[in-house]
């Protein structure tokens, strides 16, 4: 009987503590995030607000570079930044706007199409570039200066030239993709694809899975997924705009890693901490996995000693609970 009372008391203490913690997290939590995180973050938002009913998560999707520039260039306030490439945070935010980040997810490049795309029954991982270069085929990618998927598309093309041993393949692919086929973020391309204005788009595998669209898988040597081919990925690069006007940053090919951070001037620091803990914790990881986006488990903190102590402690022991 005593053990039953003891168990009941412990359960009460746990539930009371959880309720009190939820009551402490309130208010708006503004999240600027990559377009490719839109579907999983919408589900995370719903689950998070259910756990913390006093909160209101306000999300804005954009290309990761554009999302960061809302803070660095436009002076807007955000509580959380979710980037499709950790180097965007490194290159554009550190050290002025944040000093740390957490790597939490991976992805890979694919070529997405529809049932109405030209030559959909012919295209495969060996001949995709030949199909795309046919005169009646339209293909697109996102803007490299606004979105990591854009410069990753360019890096894939450069790697393809080496992998398939086709002279001038990068130039041919670039020359045959007019400006009208380029959009600010990768998810903007989906509307053009569904409208039949584009036959193929370069996009993340998770986005193709979330929209239940057919896609061509690319060889691991060029899809920017595998650490096994990191050295080969690094043989290709693409220049994008930097922090200052006229400055350029060289993006080196590497396996894809998504990252989270909190800007130094976040209005709702406690809400931001709670949201990041939720994303990198078991519930958030499960939602990411369900949406075709592999999680990094355990998540990897970079310069984490400069992050809020609660996040440091969570990474040390709580992220896998």
From Swiss-Prot:
Sorted alphabetically, which keywords does the UniProt record give?
A: Signal
Q: Name one GO molecular function term.
A: molybdate ion binding
Q: Taxonomic lineage of this organism? A: Bacteria, Thermotogati, Thermotogota, Thermotogae, Petrotogales
Give the record's GO biological process terms. molybdate ion transport
What the record says about family reads: Belongs to the bacterial solute-binding protein 1 family. WtpA subfamily.
NCBIfam families given for it? PRK04168.1, tungstate_WtpA
Q: What PANTHER family has UniProt attached to this entry?
A: MOLYBDATE-BINDING PERIPLASMIC PROTEIN, MOLYBDATE_TUNGSTATE-BINDING PROTEIN WTPA
Please give the superkingdom of this protein's source: Bacteria
Q: rRNA processing as a keyword?
A: no
- Which region is the signal sequence? 1-22
Name used for this protein in its record? Uncharacterized solute-binding protein Pmob_0379
């Amino acid at each position: 009987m005593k053990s039953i009372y003891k168990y009941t008391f412990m359960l009460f203490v746990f539930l009371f503590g959880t309720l009190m913690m939820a009551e402490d997290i309130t208010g708006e939590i503004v999240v600027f995030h990559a377009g490719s995180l839109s579907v999983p973050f919408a589900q995370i938002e719903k689950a998070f607000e259910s756990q913390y009913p006093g909160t209101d998560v306000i999300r804005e999707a954009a290309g990761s570079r554009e999302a960061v520039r809302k803070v660095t260039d436009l002076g807007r306030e955000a509580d959380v930044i979710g980037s499709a490439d950790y180097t965007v945070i490194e290159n554009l935010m550190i050290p002025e706007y944040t000093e740390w980040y957490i790597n939490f997810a991976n992805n890979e490049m694919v070529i997405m199409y529809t049932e109405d795309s030209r030559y959909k029954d012919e295209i495969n991982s060996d001949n995709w570039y030949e199909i795309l270069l046919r005169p009646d085929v339209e293909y697109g990618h996102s803007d490299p200066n606004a979105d990591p998927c854009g410069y990753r598309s360019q890096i894939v093309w450069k790697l393809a030239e080496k992998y398939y041993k086709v002279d001038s393949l990068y130039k041919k692919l670039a020359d045959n993709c007019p400006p009208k086929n380029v959009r600010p973020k990768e998810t903007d391309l989906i509307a053009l694809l569904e409208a039949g204005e584009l036959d193929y788009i370069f996009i993340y595998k998770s986005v193709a899975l979330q929209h239940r669209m057919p896609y061509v898988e690319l060889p691991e040597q060029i899809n920017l997924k595998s650490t096994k081919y990191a050295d080969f990925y690094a043989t290709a690069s693409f220049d994008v705009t930097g922090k200052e006007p006229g400055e350029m940053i060289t993006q080196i090919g590497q396996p894809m890693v998504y990252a989270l951070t909190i800007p130094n001037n976040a209005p709702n620091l406690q809400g931001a901490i709670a949201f990041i803990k939720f994303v990198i914790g078991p519930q958030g990881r499960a939602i990411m996995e369900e949406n075709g986006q592999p999680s990094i488990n355990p998540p990897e903190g970079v310069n984490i000693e400069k992050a809020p102590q609660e996040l440091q402690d969570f990474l040390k022991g709580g992220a896998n609970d």
